[in-house]
Amino acid sequence: MVGGETVKILIHACPQRMWYVEEFLAPGLEAQGAENVEIWNDTEGKGNLISCMESFAARQGYGGTWHIQDDILPCRDFVQRCREYESDGVVYGFCCEQFQDDPQRSGRVKVEDCWHSFQCVRIPDEYARDCAEWFAHRGWARSTLPELSILRGKREGDDTFFREYLQLEHRNEHVTNAKPNLVEHVDWIVGGSVLHQWRGYLARASWWDDEELILDLKEAVKGKVQYVV
């Protein structure tokens, strides 16, 4: 691990949650010292999978980018912790048991033991570009994970496809599962998929204990929530 690196952050957003991204999420990251925060807004409504792959294809250079969703809350030292992981390849910053993650598999792990959740993940830009190409030309036909028979034509899963890409193309490598988690999933506060018919539970981080930060956010966004999927 190294310190002092410039942290690149890409927020994956939908138009209905841009109020949270622009008023809270992006400014909060900048207040922590983030110098390179981009927003990838799915203005055409292509869905999380296609929008994600397009953002992967657009990555440049050979560093890494932290990809975060528009319904997360970063920890108080998020940017500093990201700097500490800047030489660690793929880093998963969020774990959720309801999303089939094993919270006990933390630290440096084999690709097969990586967490699944895509709320916060550092991806080398070279991997992102390669994954986008893999998805476009080979990934759909070669998909073997059981979930994909459900995903085709139904729910989209950028996290599932990226995990399969790692398992097929980088199976002998290791990734990092960051404990404590770097973000909390707050769709139940800012509006999101918590009330969607397919999920009726709170998908919260397994390793998060800053409830004061959660309460502060709830108070700050009171009366501002505009969207529930």
Task: Label the predicted regions.
Residues 2-68, 72-229:
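Peripheral/terminal regions associated with large enzymatic or DNA-binding modules
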